[in-house]
């Protein structure tokens, strides 16, 4: 088994990945929002768990003539914990870097919205998601903790010091794919 395959299984350690009706409905709606925005959308098997993958690439001169490869990676769980979201974020980042990250930094950037969708979200998971983006060289992750029952999607929606040229774009896409509850 490859290291990546092992990591896929490890990410689910201590997690109940049952897709309850509200979780499945939220994931389906997220897939529809991704398609409506022009993303390529598919479902992949990650160690026995169906994971929603959305992808789009955008080029802007105002980004210093760079192309941003944006992935949305969303998976079901019953309880979103900070530890689970951190593991999932690391796995999602490795996944996108393996697909589009080889030439990053040379007029290419990679971003990912790793989202765990559950029927319960621990306050620590919401706080971690809202606390800031996770960075690697020319790559950024903005984790999302979703409570499928209330529709609340906790994520960093601010303006970071690093990667600021993409901030408005990432915030716009985050709001489109994971709208703030009540909007």
Model-derived regions: residue spans:
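"Short basic amphipathic alpha-helical interaction patches in structured regions
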Residues: 85-88, 126-133
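Nucleic-acid nuclease catalytic cores
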Residues: 103-128
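Arginine/glycine-rich "motif VI" loop of SF2 helicases in the C-terminal RecA-like domain
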Residues: 101-108, 133-138
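Charged, structured surface patches that assemble and position nucleic-acid processing machinery
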Residues: 131-183
């Amino acid at each position: 088994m490859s290291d990546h395959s092992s990591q896929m299984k490890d990410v689910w350690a201590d997690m109940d990945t049952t897709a309850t009706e509200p979780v499945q409905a939220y994931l389906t709606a997220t897939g529809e929002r991704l398609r409506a925005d022009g993303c390529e959308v598919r479902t992949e098997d990650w160690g026995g768990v169906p994971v929603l993958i959305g992808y789009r690439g955008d080029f802007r001169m105002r980004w210093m003539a760079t192309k941003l490869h944006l992935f949305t990676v969303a998976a079901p769980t019953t309880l979103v914990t900070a530890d689970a979201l951190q593991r999932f974020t690391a796995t999602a980042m490795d996944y996108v870097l393996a697909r589009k990250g080889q030439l990053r930094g040379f007029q290419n950037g990679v971003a990912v919205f790793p989202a765990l969708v559950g029927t319960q979200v621990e306050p620590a998971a919401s706080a971690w998601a809202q606390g800031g983006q996770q960075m690697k060289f020319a790559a950024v992750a903005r984790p999302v903790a979703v409570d499928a029952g209330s529709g609340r999607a906790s994520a960093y929606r601010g303006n970071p010091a690093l990667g600021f040229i993409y901030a408005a774009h990432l915030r716009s896409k985050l709001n489109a794919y994971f709208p703030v509850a009540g909007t």
